[in-house]
A protein has these predicted regions:
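Extreme N-terminal starter segment of soluble prokaryotic enzymes
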Residues: 1-7, 33-34
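N-terminal phosphate/diphosphate-binding loop that engages ATP/GTP or pyrophosphate donors
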Residues: 19-86, 90, 95-98
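Conserved catalytic-core segment of NTP-binding enzymes
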Residues: 14, 30, 43, 111-195
Length: 202
């Protein structure tokens, strides 16, 4: 049976994708599932990859989780070009399918925002179109998030996805809008499954 793939994407960088991905992977593993984690692209260090690895007790080579790692803290496309490297969608999908073949559940974490360029002429929506995955959109529960989430949902729906999870990650110091954002998103996007989590660090 093919693995269930949970593709965790974000409205932006630094919104809590890694924290949520690690939490989801840990929960799935605790429930007895054979879980793999993967973050194909990472720029500016591998701290996020290490957190993912720890969530499932992985102690092997991080290249097996994160094959496309770059030094420069910019979008993966720009970072790859700065190192004279080219990453194609075929390269990416070959990696994703290989990891998925070894798991019951794969928690796949994207990089940056939903439309951030990952490689030559592709982004996270192209990966979603190439695999059967449940997209989970992560965003910070702060002012402006309603617009960001609705724009991202519109793009995901345009790509053919109608069952989308949305997770709003709490801020260390909650903002005034934090108490109403979930309700407004549910009202404006009734088909999305919207959840909120408290501040979890990161």
């Amino acid at each position: 049976m093919p693995a269930r793939i949970f593709f965790v994407v974000g409205t932006d960088t630094g919104v809590g994708k890694t924290v949520f991905s690690a939490l989801l992977a840990y929960h799935l593993k605790r429930s007895g599932r054979r879980v793999k984690v993967a973050k194909p692209f990472c720029s500016g260090g591998r701290e996020d990859v290490t957190i993912l690895a720890q969530s499932v007790g992985f102690e092997g080579n991080l290249d097996l989780i994160n094959p496309f790692s770059f030094a420069l803290p910019v979008s993966p496309l720009v970072a790859a070009r700065s190192e004279g490297r080219v990453v194609s969608l075929d390269d990416t999908m070959g990696f994703v399918r290989s990891v998925a073949s070894e798991a019951e559940d794969l928690v796949l974490e994207g990089a940056g925002g939903l439309l951030s360029p990952l490689g030559e002429c592709f982004d996270s929506t192209d990966i979603l179109e190439a695999i059967e995955a449940d997209p989970i959109l992560v965003a910070k529960n702060r002012i402006g998030v309603v617009n960001q989430v609705l724009l991202s949902l519109r793009e995901l729906e345009r790509s053919g996805h109608t069952s989308i999870g949305v997770v709003l990650m709490g801020e260390e110091i909650p903002e005034e809008s934090g108490s109403s954002n979930v309700g407004v998103i549910r009202e404006c996007a009734p088909t999305a499954r919207v959840f909120e989590l408290p501040y979890l660090g990161g």
